[in-house]
Amino acid sequence: MTTIAKQDKIFMKRSGAYHSELDKDIVQKAGNFPLMQFKTKVKVNPKFLLKGDDMDIVDEAITYYKANVFYKNFDMSICEADKLLVYLIFYIQSLLLKFNGRTKVECDKMAYSLAIENFALPGDGKFCLGGIVEPLKASEKEVVRQYMTAIRNETGLRLTQAVFKNDPTKCDKWWMCFNKRKFLNKTI
């Protein structure tokens, strides 16, 4: 059992933020980090593929980003899916910082390269959720890395569609006005 650091307990205080309603889509847990189904055209393990037009965790993260980015506290004990939602909000925040002043084509390329770069896995020392997520077993690491790469890639694709909805040459100002906000006073 891992101990939760004092600063991470502050994370978990009750807040009025939007929480995930998609606990039913959790397919597997790695440590205590949820791996959920999502819609994608990116290559992913079939058990993580969500069919249909229902809202998935990526839709939730993009939809709730603007509202949740203002919160300094987020209670992740309400549902397990919140851990992935918070991670995706951090990821969206890092993408928006890089999108400023670029075109859709440039942002698509940047989002893809950011998705496949080396990143901290849940339970690693540099992972953005710190002590809230348990370390992974050696057998889980490769599955989680593939899953996280696919969901980061899909999040980047959908975010560029949202940010460049009106004009492929210019970022939407209603998205970019949030790019300097720090969700939970952290970045990834």
Swiss-Prot record:
GO terms for molecular function: actin binding. GO terms for cellular component: Arp2/3 protein complex; cytoplasm. The keyword Cytoplasm applies. Keywords: Actin-binding, Cytoplasm, Cytoskeleton. One of its GO terms (biological process) is regulation of actin filament polymerization. Its main location: cytoplasm. InterPro entries: ARPC3, ARPC3_sf. It is found in: Cytoplasm, Cytoskeleton. Functions as a component of the Arp2/3 complex which is involved in regulation of actin polymerization and together with an activating nucleation-promoting factor (NPF) mediates the formation of branched actin networks. Belongs to the ARPC3 family. Component of the Arp2/3 complex. This is Actin-related protein 2/3 complex subunit 3. It comes from Entamoeba histolytica (strain ATCC 30459 / HM-1:IMSS / ABRM).
